[in-house]
Structures are given as C-alpha cells and as structure tokens.
Amino acid sequence: MKYEEALEYISQTNKFGIRLGLENIGKLLELLGNPQETLNIIHVAGTNGKGSVCSFVSNILRECGYKVGLYTSPYLETFTERIRVNGQNIPQDDVARIIELIKEKIEIMVKEGYAYPTEFEVVTAMAFYYYSEQKVDFVALEVGLGGRYDATNIITKSLVSVIVSISLDHTGILGDTIEKIAYEKAGIIKENGVVLVYDQTDEAKDVIKSVCKEKKAKYIEVDFDDINIKKSDINSQIYDCTVMKETYRDLEIKLIGEHQINNSILAISVIKYLKDLNKLANINEESIRKGLINTKWPGRIEKIKENPIFIIDGAHNEDGAKSLAKALDKNFKGRKLTLLIGMLEDKDIDSVLEILLPHFNKVITTTPNNPRAINSDILREKVLKYVDDVTSKHEIEDAVNYTLETSSEDDII
C-alpha cells in the first residue's frame, strides 16, 4: 500500500461519520496487540485549548530529554501532523505500512460482526501503534470529541487527566448545557486517578468534582490568580507566575492571548505533577522556559504576514470568539480591521458573529472545503446584520486574493 492509497482508505471511513463508543476501537486495538497499554499518557479533554496544552507539555518534556508522542486533531496543512514524535510528523511510509495492517484487522472485525471503525478510530489506533513501536517515554493525547466515549478514552490508565476550558460546542452530540458537556469531558478521569482542571464555571466544577468523588480520583484546580503580564503583543507574551508554590519570572511564549498564558501554566502544572510522581528525573526551570518559548501552534491567533498584517485563527465557538476579540482589542484597538470568515453550519454561528463583528469594518465571507460548511452567500446575509461592507467569495483562494487586493498595507486582516 502506498501513502496516497492509505489516505484514500482513511477518507473512505469518513462515510461512517462520528460514532461515539469504545467497543469498535477496543476490538481493533486488541487485534493490534493493545499497543496503548505500553504508553505513559497525559490525556487532555476540554472545549478550547486542548492542542495548545498538549503542545506545551510535549515541548517541555522534549527539552527534558524525553521522547514524546503528540496526538492532535484536526490537521491544518498535512495529515501526518496529527501524529508526531519529538516534533517530527509520522513518515508517510509508516502511515502506509500501519494502515495496511489495520485494514487486515478491520476485515477480521467485520467478519466477526463488528461495525466498520470510523476515521477517528482508525487514526487513533494507528497513533497508538506507532507510538508503541517508537518506544516513546510519554504521549500527550488530545481527545477528539467529548471524552467519555471518545476513541482516545479506550486507555485504561493515564499518568494524569487534564480538563481545559469547557464551553458550549458540539451540543448536538455532547449535550446542550455546560453540565452535560462537563460530564462527557470528565469521562476521561480514571479510577483512583488524578485530574488537573482549568478554571471553570461553578457548574462545570461541580460536575467534575462529582465524577472524581465517584471514581475516588484526586481533583486539582490550577490557580491563575498570581500572574503578572509584563508584555503582550502580537509577537509574544512575557509574564511572571506562581505554579504549585514555585515562582517563575519572565517566562515567554509565542502564542498570543491571555488564555494561552493560562494554558501554559496548566502545562507547567502537569510537568510539576509528573515530577512529584517521580516520573521526571531531569526536569529543571531551563527546560520549562525553552519548552514554552519553542511552542508553536499554527492557526491560533497566528500572524502569517506583514504589510498588511494577516492573522489566522480557528475560533468556532463562543469562548474561542471571546478570546480572539480580546486579543484584537488589546493589540489593534482603533485600527482598521478586515475579517475573512468561513464557518461550518453546525457551529454556533450567531454567537460567534455577535462577539466578533463589532471589531470589524469590512467582512469577506467564503465557503470552507467541508461538507458541513455554510454557504458564503448565506453567511453574508447573517453578517449584514452587523456590518454594511460585506462581500461573498465562494472559493477560498478567490476570497484571500480579493481580501489582499482590497486592503492597504496599514490594514489588519
């Protein structure tokens, strides 16, 4: 099997959609020899910030000299970036080789009466198999959707569970209240385990604490009160903070927005907890500093161009939109802002627009390359409630070119 054939096989599993449950992934992994059982996993769930926290944790551990797997989704540029070891994407040849093996196992499953695995189940199985082959020391594992019945939650043990910011998203699948969504996220907490928790609403905290009580797990709420931000602009942020009674001065991150400072502190808390577990022999402050500053997470308030400044961000729910709006307000207040936007129909479009659009003078709508995308003309009609200067361009390339052609060097896109 060639790499292109492997991708085609994976894409065919798309037709099985999203199916939450652990029976299928469990059988597939059993046929692969249960590779996940060999791994030391930091398991991260939540609505916003999962990938950033996983990336911070992964980079700090690498700076400590460990071999670290990083599993995230979706991908931004190339499929192989979903499965990384020490910053390197899984090689295409390994994708082809492992998918060929997985295909054989799936045929056995189906003959035994099991359903075809979904795309996410197939890719998750491949990740576990690859990390086990690579004999990684740790895996920073990002939940795909929810937690309780997510394919990543087939693991029976983790070093620590982490729950980042929780807000309303995927309400059709996870539930339409913070309490219901928090319950799904808290599903990653293990019996007698430990969970590190981002600052949450009281409703979310109560649910997570209740799950911890039921599972005899330890609940640790990360404190974000003692933070002194010394510098914050579109290029980097410098801050002092105290994490688990240890003070750090002049930490620097390249990720933008106050929420990313909180995400970095959550990552430091994970590292310090692992040290307390005697899982880290060679952790030091310099490793933490280097890991933080070397963390890049594309598509999160990321500046990709100057003159005009061009920023890309993946905000697609209310909390994500608030974080983006806050960062724009802080860095570009009073400047002329242009928004190029495309969204999926199943997102909370109205809430996102209501939060973001007061910051923009001009808007270009486009249609993402996704079967769930909202048509750019329909999106334009929604935007017109807030902004007068709105243009619809169906093709993304046309939309980008039009945006650049109609902007001056002083504009912010």
Question: Where are these predicted regions, by residue range?
Answer:
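Acidic, Mg2+-coordinating active-site environments of NTP-dependent enzymes
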Residues: V110-E112, Q134-E142, S158-D250, S264, ...
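Nucleotide phosphate-binding/pyrophosphate-handling subdomain across enzymes
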Residues: T38, F138-L141, Y149-V162, I166-H170, ...
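Short functional linear segments
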Residues: M1-G46, V53-Y66, Y71, E107-Y114
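C-terminal helical cap/extension that packs against the catalytic core
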Residues: T201-S210, K216, I220, N235, ...
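Glycine-rich phosphate-binding loop signature in dinucleotide/nucleotide-binding domains
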Residues: Y131-D137, K330-R335, T403-I412
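ATP-dependent carboxylate-amine ligase catalytic core
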Residues: L29-E30, N34-E37, E63-T156, G172-L174
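Beta-strand->loop->alpha-helix junctions that form or flank phosphate-binding loops
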Residues: P74, Y198-D199, K213-D233, E252-E258, ...
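Hydrophobic alpha-helical packing residues
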Residues: V57-R62, Y131, L356, V383
